[in-house]
Swiss-Prot record:
Listed GO biological process terms: DNA recombination; DNA repair
Record-listed E.C. numbers: 3.6.4.-
UniProt-annotated binding residues for ATP: L19, R20, G61, K64, T65, T66, E127, D128, F129, R170, Y180, R217
InterPro entries the UniProt entry points to: AAA+_ATPase (IPR003593), AAA_lid_4 (IPR041445), DNA_helicase_Holl-junc_RuvB (IPR004605), P-loop_NTPase (IPR027417), RuvB-like_N (IPR008824), RuvB_C (IPR008823), WH-like_DNA-bd_sf (IPR036388), WH_DNA-bd_sf (IPR036390)
Binding residues for Mg(2+): T65
Compartments, as annotated in UniProt: Cytoplasm
Region Head domain (RuvB-H), residue ranges: 254-337
Keyword Repeat annotated: no
One term of GO molecular function: ATP binding
Protein name: Holliday junction branch migration complex subunit RuvB
Catalytic activity annotation: ATP + H2O = ADP + phosphate + H(+)
Similarity-based family: Belongs to the RuvB family.
Gene behind the chain: ruvB
Known partners and oligomeric status: Homohexamer. Forms an RuvA(8)-RuvB(12)-Holliday junction (HJ) complex. HJ DNA is sandwiched between 2 RuvA tetramers; dsDNA enters through RuvA and exits via RuvB. An RuvB hexamer assembles on each DNA strand where it exits the tetramer. Each RuvB hexamer is contacted by two RuvA subunits (via domain III) on 2 adjacent RuvB subunits; this complex drives branch migration. In the full resolvosome a probable DNA-RuvA(4)-RuvB(12)-RuvC(2) complex forms which resolves the HJ.
Amino acid sequence: MTRLISADKSEDDLLEASLRPRALSDYVGQEKAKGNLGLFIDAARGRGEALDHVLLYGPPGLGKTTLANIIACEMGVNIKSTSGPVIERPGDLAAILTNLEAHDVLFIDEIHRLSHVVEEILYPAMEDFQLDIIIGQGPSARTIKLDLPKFTLVGATTRAGLLSSPLRDRFGVISRLEFYTHDELAFIITRSARIFGMAIAPEGAMELARRSRGTPRIANRLLRRVRDFAQVRADGVITRAVADQALALLEIDEMGFDMMDRAILLTIIDKFGGGPVGLDTIAAAISEESDTIEDVYEPFLIQNGFLNRTPRGRVATAAAYSHFGRIAPEPPQGKLF
């Protein structure tokens, strides 16, 4: 079952293509990253050169793919999109690289999942715009260098720490994408509603924004589900009351928590005295994979102050207790002797 407020892509998100802006001036939020990219793009265009390689990292659903497409549009070049898991062999990467034209953009999503062997092929391609090809086998094998057109690699990752240092060091532009503010999300939701021909009140857009976990992909997904509710059980207009009723039906609370978020926090609070408790123990208690908890659920809980990671395990914060109407335990007092 697909998690409604997961920031990962789903089939339902294919509609996102029609919502994506095509110019930096239309892109909402990420002002620091947007400002830097605009400067570097203008400079590269002025010199008639390819833009330096770009690494975009941050939680899923914040607009990394959109920015990659905007870079290509602003540079006036083509974009070839792929992902790390798809490029299984060096030959797969070689086929992609040799089909690029001068100044084209190659977008690799989930670039942290490239194999070490494929990375080795990518290094000279990024640095020297050359492809090392081995001809023959055994003692008679030899390497020839194939020149490549100067291109821009745009890599996207949710786990920058998993990138090898040699790969990370070859990116000239590195930008971190942050969670969006409520005002930015409300603007995005209003724009999406206009494109889809939906009627939405400002307070309805803000209510959706508050529960979208700072993520445009989640905001657009919730908008489509609330639209269905408004169409069937209301007069078609998404007001704050309609949004509140629809989200209550979907079991998404005022913080944007769903059942799994609540299960994680309540497990720590009720079963393990607020923590610290190990990740594997939490995973076993709620029947979920440890990696899924760490990569999908925890970032939002930690960034919003509901969960702490400590060397001894996960700890529920006072904000988590307050959210569920519980009284947080007093911190232990240190002994004098």
